[in-house]
Curated annotation (Swiss-Prot):
Cleavable signal peptide: 1-25
A Gene Ontology cellular-component term: extracellular region
Compartment(s): Secreted
GO molecular function: G protein-coupled receptor binding; hormone activity
This protein's UniProt keywords: Cleavage on pair of basic residues, Disulfide bond, Hormone, Secreted, Signal
Protein task: May play a role in neuropeptide signaling processes. Ligand for LGR7, RXFP3 and RXFP4.
Oligomer status and interactors: Heterodimer of a B chain and an A chain linked by two disulfide bonds.
Gene: RLN3
Family in the record: Belongs to the insulin family.
Name the UniProt record assigns to this protein: Relaxin-3
């Protein structure tokens, strides 16, 4: 009787997965833990992979010949460009870059905005290292 109880206990233990080989190697339920260089490589692979370039090429091919008469207008546009470059406004802007930027808000006035994406990256990298993250979370950085 004790022998059957021991076999029953052993069977329950095996069925719960405690003795299966690979039970220790299961992935974390949240995602893959990536720290340091591995996190950066995963971001580069996800954001700069061939999938993104391929989608750009396919989108361009799908557009096809959207502007068939663009070549005919090219000569007239080139003439207008030469005329505009000879104007006094263009010459004033090329001689004085400050005149172009006068009256526009400076990027130096909002340093918090520039650091925002960097803070998101730092937060996601530390959480990916501690708890793991999914590919969709990494692709949110693209």
């Amino acid at each position: 009787m004790a022998r059957y109880m021991l076999l029953l206990l052993l069977a329950v233990w095996v069925l719960t997965g405690e003795l299966w080989p690979g039970a220790e190697a299961r992935a974390a339920p949240y995602g893959v833990r990536l720290c340091g260089r591995e996190f950066i490589r995963a971001v580069i692979f996800t954001c700069g992979g061939s999938r993104w370039r391929r989608s750009d090429i396919l989108a361009h091919e799908a557009m096809g010949d959207t502007f068939p008469d663009a070549d005919a207008d090219e000569d007239s546009l080139a003439g207008e460009l030469d005329e505009a470059m000879g104007s006094s406004e263009w010459l004033a802007l090329t001689k004085s870059p400050q005149a172009f930027y006068r009256g526009r808000p400076s990027w130096q006035g909002t340093p918090g905005v520039l650091r925002g994406s960097r803070d998101v990256l730092a937060g996601l990298s530390s959480s990916c290292c501690k708890w793991g993250c999914s590919k969709s979370e990494i692709s949110s950085l693209c």
